[in-house]
Amino acid sequence: MSKLTQVFKQTKLCIGYLTAGDGGTSYTIEAAKALIQGGVDILELGFPFSDPVADNPEIQVSHDRALAENLTSETLLEIVEGIRAFNQEVPLILYSYYNPLLQRDLDYLRRLKDAGINGVCVIDLPAPLSHGEKSPFFEDLLAVGLDPILLISAGTTPERMSLIQEYARGFLYYIPCQATRDSEVGIKEEFRKVREHFDLPIVDRRDICDKKEAAHVLNYSDGFIVKTAFVHQTTMDSSVETLTALAQTVIPG
C-alpha cells in the first residue's frame, strides 16, 4: 500500500496547495512548514508553467511569479528536500502540467522520489484511451515508485474508469458536476457510483475556502483541497505565520 493510500486510512484529510517558487525557494519551504504546522495532512506543490490554463487567475499569477523567481526543475528538488528536512511524514504531491515534465527523463523522476515526492498529478495528461494502450509517462512514474494521481469527473464513463484503474494509485481526484456539487444527495450519489469502480480514496477537487464548505465536502469525500485561499494569503502577507492560522481556520475540528 502506498504512503498516500495509507494516510487516508487514518482519517479524512486536508490537502494544501502552494506554487513552488512563488516568493522564492526559501519562502516556499517556510510556507510549507507553516501549512504543516497548521494541520495540513498532504502538501501539493505546483510546478510552475507559463500557460496554466486549468487554473484560476490567482493561481495563474502565482505561476508567473514563480517563473520570475527562476524556479527550475533543480530548485524544485531543493524545495522538496528543504521540506523533508523539516518533516518526513506528511506526503508530498507534485502538481504539474505535462509540458514542464515532458523533457524530464526517468532519472529526474527518480530524483523527485528520492527527494521526498510521493505522487504526481499531471492535470492535462489523461490515462490511455483504449485497453492495451500504454502511457510511457505513467509507466515511468510507477517504475520509480511514484503514485500517478489521476482525475475523474461526473462525465467519466464506466468504460473510461476501467482504463483509469490501470494506472491510478494513491487516491483519485474527483471533479463534481456543477449541477449537483451543492446538493449533498446528488454528490453523494456521484461518489457512490465512483466507489463501485475504485478501492482508492476519492477526494473532491473543488477549491475549498472555509471550514463550512470543508465540512460539507467531508460528508462524502475522503478529503478536500485548499488552493486559492493559501496562494492568496501568500500575496497578502509575507509572514508565514498567517498561513498556519489560516489553515487552522479552514480545517474542521
Swiss-Prot record:
EC nos: 4.2.1.20
Gene3D superfamilies: Aldolase class I (3.20.20.70)
Keyword terms: Amino-acid biosynthesis, Aromatic amino acid biosynthesis, Lyase, Tryptophan biosynthesis
Keyword check for Amino-acid biosynthesis: yes
Pathway the protein acts in: Amino-acid biosynthesis; L-tryptophan biosynthesis; L-tryptophan from chorismate: step 5/5
Family the UniProt entry places it in: Belongs to the TrpA family.
Residues the record marks as active site: E44 (proton acceptor), D55 (proton acceptor)
Gene Ontology molecular-function annotations: tryptophan synthase activity
Catalytic activity: (1S,2R)-1-C-(indol-3-yl)glycerol 3-phosphate + L-serine = D-glyceraldehyde 3-phosphate + L-tryptophan + H2O
InterPro entries the UniProt entry points to: Aldolase_TIM, RibuloseP-bd_barrel, Trp_synthase_alpha_AS, Trp_synthase_suA
Role this protein plays: The alpha subunit is responsible for the aldol cleavage of indoleglycerol phosphate to indole and glyceraldehyde 3-phosphate.
One GO term of the biological process aspect: L-tryptophan biosynthetic process
Example of a GO cellular component annotation carried by this entry: cytosol
Cited CDD domains: Tryptophan_synthase_alpha
Subunit organization: Tetramer of two alpha and two beta chains.
UniProt protein name: Tryptophan synthase alpha chain
Alphabetical list of Pfam families matching this protein: Trp_syntA
